[in-house]
Amino acid sequence: MLRIADKTFDSHLFTGTGKFASSQLMVEAIRASGSQLVTLAMKRVDLRQHNDAILEPLIAAGVTLLPNTSGAKTAEEAIFAAHLAREALGTNWLKLEIHPDARWLLPDPIETLKAAETLVQQGFVVLPYCGADPVLCKRLEEVGCAAVMPLGAPIGSNQGLETRAMLEIIIQQATVPVVVDAGIGVPSHAAQALEMGADAVLVNTAIAVADDPVNMAKAFRLAVEAGLLARQSGPGSRSYFAHATSPLTGFLEASA
């Protein structure tokens, strides 16, 4: 069971809504993933219409919606988008994204921290997408963010946990949930994130662009479950030396 702010989730896999070939395929994949928290970009939906092609099936599916501020380049733009989302969707939950460079889509640490502090004061449950910077993640936690969402690699790159060393520090020092977001390309990446101590992962591109998004979503669900179970089972420690699993000389001594 994963708890973030006032909500609990059975699934440790969060999903996105972008890049799917159709809304129907998107919903089928989300259901197959078992995800209970789904993020959506405000710029992709008509907030005035609950029968929007993306919004309506998500509401019908009964998932928790996590609007994001993707496309915002400054703290001010993100705060404005957050208030639009709260008014239209009736939720205080927000994935804070501020990335001014459209080529790399890397989060702006200064603007993100600035916006997070203001939004928390205004009553939002803020989950900030951020770089894998342990100092920044701690600062975001200190200003009241409900979780932190450091990247594994650039958005949509499918490179995996390229920031693993920093993620390990973030996880070790965090007192709020850590959700690895961005760059996760295959289910094994998700399993590794859970094994190393992450509380959840957010996956979008890897599922949406797969030849079979529904089966890929199932694969991610199983990988997250396996990674969490492995961590809870207490993996053995790594060693520089070999350690035999069977006696090496006993049978020789017995036959002598």
Curated annotation (Swiss-Prot):
Homotetramer. Forms heterodimers with either ThiH or ThiS. Catalyzes the rearrangement of 1-deoxy-D-xylulose 5-phosphate (DXP) to produce the thiazole phosphate moiety of thiamine. Sulfur is provided by the thiocarboxylate moiety of the carrier protein ThiS. In vitro, sulfur can be provided by H(2)S. One of its GO terms (biological process) is thiamine biosynthetic process. InterPro entries: Aldolase_TIM, Thiazole_synthase_ThiG, ThiG. This is Thiazole synthase. It holds the Pfam family ThiG. It is found in: Cytoplasm. The keyword Cytoplasm applies. Signal peptide: none annotated. The active site is at 95 (schiff-base intermediate with dxp). Belongs to the ThiG family. Its main location: cytoplasm. It catalyses: [ThiS sulfur-carrier protein]-C-terminal-Gly-aminoethanethioate + 2-iminoacetate + 1-deoxy-D-xylulose 5-phosphate = [ThiS sulfur-carrier protein]-C-terminal Gly-Gly + 2-[(2R,5Z)-2-carboxy-4-methylthiazol-5(2H)-ylidene]ethyl phosphate + 2 H2O + H(+). It comes from the Bacteria. Its EC number is 2.8.1.10. 1-deoxy-D-xylulose 5-phosphate binds at residues 156, 182-183, 204-205. Pathway: Cofactor biosynthesis; thiamine diphosphate biosynthesis. One of its GO terms (cellular component) is 2-iminoacetate synthase complex. One of its GO terms (molecular function) is thiazole synthase activity.
